[in-house]
Amino acid sequence: MADFKEYAKKLIEIEGGYVDHPNDAGGITMQGVTLTTFRQYCGEDKTVADLRNMSYGTWCDIMKDLYWDKCLADEIENQAVAEITVDWCVNSGTQGLRKVQEIAGTKPDGIAGPKTLAAINGANQKELFDRIMSARNQFYVNIVKKNPTQRVFMNGWMNRLGRFKFE
């Protein structure tokens, strides 16, 4: 079964530090946690300074509770498939899980449950991983086609995808 701690090591490196880019639809982020998400999780009174000073423990709690656990990733048998699935959600919200569900051949409702797990775990893991990677690549291409201001993020998105390897 997949292990959050392994993914967390990779994710913290991918996400880096504080970002406040004017073209980023997510707005202000710290290590991949948006200010909006931080406030929803930690309290509406939290400030940008609080976000910037977020502890590693709080970051892990947010990533595990809001992304890893919502994808039921502890129950995904292959670490690489779990990571690429959860990472799409970290990077793109529930539409990431809907896309993975669609690729795995189950109802794309954005809610992980027994049918989603059965479809993911029942698939050829290498083929599923490759299909998710390909779909995610195309997802980013489509974002830029629809909104050329997002081109500034393309290299980062491709570098992010490049961090995931099937094992």
Mark where each language-model region is.
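Cell-wall polysaccharide-cleaving catalytic domain and substrate-binding groove, primarily
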Residues: 1-167
